[in-house]
């Protein structure tokens, strides 16, 4: 009689994804971030569920309800700090995961890649609406600034913004619907993650050599199941350490002040993981242009497979493109720094140069380097 896990309709799916899955024997720790993102999502849904049990999405009580969670709910402070910092770890993992995909040519699995970009957009949207919920100063003003960007859309912009707000400013209706979105979106993300995996398991994983690994596969369990557990342990230890020792390190002090529509904070800026996109938005002196650049800074990832010119998949044996890849990483770091700086000289010009370089690397330099390397290898 065959093993139940290989015959049962449901267990068979789990078996083919987590136990008997053939995996390349040489995938490095860079292939751990997919499972780490799954862990992040599970942790965020779990902590978020417990927070939602005590949170009230009303402007009169939202801020106080978060204070109540931290002061009066058993381990509420821990749940809140794990959830807030869990978002940062989520983005660290997602950016490393995307970086791995860019470096090793994983984007050539187009369906998997495009679902991944949609997942990135969904996670960013979830983080944005979630940041509004504590109803602190930066929550309120961040929501005001970012939702206002929709008014740049010709003709329907203003109506669209008021429709999104549910009034003439960010108010109670806005907070209530953002809570609804923030509760709903993670489950949509979980569903999209399943689709992401279905597409991935059609082709299997890439590997650090960028070569076909069909001749050299090992089973996912026990090798990579245990490797993933090691990753889980490291991530959870780091998250718990941050949540226990320095829970406010990555937050904005302005958000410890309740929202006040009459007082604008001196520097409105998002959380660190949005700063690179915020810098690109600010570097264009035209509202609509800035919004389009902001959108395109993420959507450009969908163009990467189309712009792939090299005969080789990974950057492992492509020194020219490797240099450009690390230039891109440095550029994103500079954009992240600029996004948190005030709009004044010399930060304005640095931001504009870095924004130009960001698009120039993706659209011009990487495809050109690929062609040049083809010539070199010919």
Curated annotation (Swiss-Prot):
User: What is the recorded name of this protein?
Assistant: Cytochrome b
Any one Gene Ontology BP term: mitochondrial electron transport, ubiquinol to cytochrome c
PANTHER family cross-referenced by the UniProt entry: CYTOCHROME B
Tell me the keywords, alphabetical order: Electron transport, Heme, Iron, Membrane, Metal-binding, Mitochondrion, Mitochondrion inner membrane, Respiratory chain, Transmembrane, Transmembrane helix, Transport, Ubiquinone
A UniProt-annotated Pfam family: Cytochrom_B_C
Annotated heme b b562 binding sites: 83, 182
What assembly does the database describe for this protein?
A: The cytochrome bc1 complex contains 3 respiratory subunits (MT-CYB, CYC1 and UQCRFS1), 2 core proteins (UQCRC1 and UQCRC2) and probably 6 low-molecular weight proteins.
Entry membrane topology? Multi-pass membrane protein
Q: Which gene does this sequence derive from? A: mt-cyb
Family (UniProt): Belongs to the cytochrome b family.
- Which residues of the sequence carry a binding annotation for heme b b566? 97, 196
Q: Which cofactor does it need?
A: heme b
Molecular function (GO) terms listed?
A: metal ion binding; ubiquinol-cytochrome-c reductase activity
Q: Where does the UniProt entry say this protein principally localizes?
A: mitochondrion
PROSITE patterns recorded: CYTB_CTER (PS51003), CYTB_NTER (PS51002)
Summary of the function given for this chain in its UniProt record: Component of the ubiquinol-cytochrome c reductase complex (complex III or cytochrome b-c1 complex) that is part of the mitochondrial respiratory chain. The b-c1 complex mediates electron transfer from ubiquinol to cytochrome c. Contributes to the generation of a proton gradient across the mitochondrial membrane that is then used for ATP synthesis.
Q: Which domain of life is it from?
A: Eukaryota
Membrane-spanning intervals of the chain:
33-53, 77-98, 113-133, 178-198, 226-246, 288-308, 320-340, 347-367
Q: From which organism does this entry originate?
A: Hypselecara temporalis
Enumerate the residues binding a ubiquinone.
Answer: 201
In its miscellaneous comment, the UniProt entry states: Heme 1 (or BL or b562) is low-potential and absorbs at about 562 nm, and heme 2 (or BH or b566) is high-potential and absorbs at about 566 nm.
* Cofactor binding note of this UniProt entry: Binds 2 heme b groups non-covalently.
Location in the cell:
Mitochondrion inner membrane
Of the GO CC terms on this record, one is: respiratory chain complex III
């Amino acid at each position: 009689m065959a093993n139940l896990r290989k015959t049962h309709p449901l267990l068979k799916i789990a078996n083919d994804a987590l136990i008997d899955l053939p995996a390349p024997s040489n995938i490095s720790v860079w292939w751990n971030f997919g499972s780490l993102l799954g862990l992040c999502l599970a942790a965020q849904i779990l902590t978020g569920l417990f927070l939602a049990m005590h949170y009230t999405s009303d402007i009169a009580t939202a801020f106080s309800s978060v204070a109540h969670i931290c002061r009066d709910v058993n381990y509420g402070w821990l749940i809140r700090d794990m959830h807030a910092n869990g978002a940062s770890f989520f983005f660290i993992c997602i950016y490393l995961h995307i970086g791995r995909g860019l470096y090793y040519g994983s984007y050539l699995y187009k369906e998997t890649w495009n679902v991944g970009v949609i997942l990135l957009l969904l996670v960013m949207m979830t983080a944005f609406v979630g940041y509004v919920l504590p109803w602190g100063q930066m929550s309120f003003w961040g929501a005001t600034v970012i939702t206002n960007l929709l008014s740049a859309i010709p003709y329907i912009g203003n109506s669209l913004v008021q429709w999104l707000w549910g009034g003439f400013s960010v108010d109670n209706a806005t907070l209530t619907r953002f809570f609804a979105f923030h509760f709903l979106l993670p489950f949509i993300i979980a569903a999209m993650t399943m689709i992401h995996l279905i597409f991935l398991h059609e082709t299997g994983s890439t590997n650090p050599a960028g070569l076909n690994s069909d001749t050299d596969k090992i089973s996912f369990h026990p090798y990579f199941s245990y490797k993933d557990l090691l990753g889980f342990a490291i991530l959870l230890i780091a998250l718990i350490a941050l949540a226990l020792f320095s829970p406010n390190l990555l937050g904005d002090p302005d958000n410890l002040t309740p929202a006040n529509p009459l007082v604008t904070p001196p520097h409105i800026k998002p959380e660190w993981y949005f700063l690179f996109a915020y810098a690109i938005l600010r570097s264009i002196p035209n509202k609509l242009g800035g919004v389009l650049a902001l959108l395109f800074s993420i959507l450009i990832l969908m163009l990467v497979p189309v712009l792939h010119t090299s005969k080789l998949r990974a950057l492992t044996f492509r020194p020219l493109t490797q240099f450009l890849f690390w230039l891109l990483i440095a550029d994103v770091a500079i954009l992240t720094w600029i996004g948190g700086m005030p709009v004044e000289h010399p930060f304005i010009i640095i931001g504009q140069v870095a924004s130009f370089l960001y698009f120039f690397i993706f659209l011009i330099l990487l495809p050109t380097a690929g062609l040049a390397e083809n010539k070199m290898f010919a």
